Amino acid sequence: PWMDTGVEVVLLTPYRDWQMLPFHRTMAAGEKLAAVRLEAAREEWYYVLTGTIEITLTSDECFVLEEGDAIHFESSRLHQVANPTKQTATFICMMTPPQL
């Protein structure tokens, strides 16, 4: 679901059965990913490099993250990532354990 149109994903390290998967994302202006809920015992961490992204957790908590902001949450919570602006956003995301 996170490979929707308008999102470019680049792995930052070769995937070799690591416990953590870091990648760089570029999200087009106005793009919104489908809401997902991953298996229990998973975590995600986001750090915004440029632009603004919006992360909604469990439909009732919305966080607007700008350059230099970070967020960490359990992937078992329903979550959605969006770029609500007219500018491209870039950010680093880490997932543990990895899931592509």
List each language-model region with its residue ranges.
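A short glycine-rich, His/Asp/Glu-containing loop-to-beta-strand
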Residues: 1-36, 43, 94-99
